[in-house]
From Swiss-Prot:
NCBIfam families: nqrB, PRK05349.1. It comes from Vibrio alginolyticus. Composed of six subunits; NqrA, NqrB, NqrC, NqrD, NqrE and NqrF. It is found in: Cell inner membrane. The modification FMN phosphoryl threonine is found at residue 236. Its EC number is 7.2.1.1. The keyword Amino-acid biosynthesis does not apply. Its main location: membrane. The gene is nqrB. It is a multi-pass membrane protein. This is Na(+)-translocating NADH-quinone reductase subunit B. Pfam families: NQR2_RnfD_RnfE. The keyword tRNA-binding does not apply. PANTHER family: ELECTRON TRANSPORT COMPLEX PROTEIN RNFD, NA(+)-TRANSLOCATING NADH-QUINONE REDUCTASE SUBUNIT B.
Amino acid sequence: MALKKFLEDIEHHFEPGGKHEKWFALYEAVATVFYTPGIVTNKSSHVRDSVDLKRIMIMVWFAVFPAMFWGMYNAGGQAIAALNHMYAGDQLATVISGNWHYWLTEMLGGTIAADAGVGSKMLLGATYFLPIYATVFLVGGFWEVLFCMVRKHEVNEGFFVTSILFALIVPPTLPLWQAALGITFGVVVAKEIFGGTGRNFLNPALAGRAFLFFAYPAQISGDVVWTAADGFSGATALSQWAQGGNGALVNTVTGSPITWMDAFIGNIPGSIGEVSTLALMIGAAMIVYMRIASWRIIAGVMIGMIAVSTLFNVIGSDTNPMFNMPWHWHLVLGGFAFGMFFMATDPVSASFTNKGKWWYGILIGAMCVMIRVVNPAYPEGMMLAILFANLFAPLFDHVVIEKNIKRRLARYGK
């Protein structure tokens, strides 16, 4: 109650005419994190619901926690396994002392030894993920608050989701300055220039990642960025399949084959939050149950992916192993599951109409497989498929609405 009274006592300073009027957006953002805003309608409302934009965004934020925690554990585990595979004794100690992530982990009570437990793996993974997330949150939050102050309206809570989604779809070794550049592009160019939350036609997190992919490909793709171990090089499972098919899927540290269950659980290198389809399904179940994410879009993505991957399986190829990848492997490799559950279902950049959502999802699933199979330079296709579908979402809605209008006119004889 003391906090609420304090906020109420200083509120008048941020209202129009107050000495801190220009900082109202920042005050409102902090106050509404803890308490419901006092703004009410002056007429009877048509729909009464305790869930507002802030609560919806917070639920999505919580929904990615399973993937986030597993991603930190997996990133730490992959790094520890690789380090102990390459180095031993004094050489390992030298490597640890030369990397602040490693020595910070040991200083906080963790260990980089081969027998490191869950806590040490989680701790090491956190030293990679949390700085990226903090950088993205602070830099992106700065731009969000700046635009809100200029436009004189409250801070939109959509950035809570954008920041964590962006941090989860990049490699654990991404330089912090590149993370800052990527989120700057996503927030400013893909969102704020078009009017802010609710007016952007591209997914800001994906737009930021696409910017980094084309501007700095060496730090966000290739074989050396996915495992946070100095001097280690290892391709992702999707890249391995693109090179040699199912038989080429091996753990780059132990040399043992990668099974479908390994990929489903997330015991493979990759972007921090994209590796575990199981963890992503848990989070997706939350937002689908709460009707935040559209099940029609998710079903459409699956239908498009299964149909096109099956078509390529039937066609076959002796020179391109990706033609032979079954749909259930497409599901668990790369960023497909993350994109399907948390990116494609973005309510702003996706289609609004029910029929439009089906076609929007089908286009994403089909395009993802086509890019993975046909494009020889880039085995991943989910990011580009969703951004491509974002451009078509308004067209799908326009066609559906026009057809509904014509159907109603014909029904009533006009």
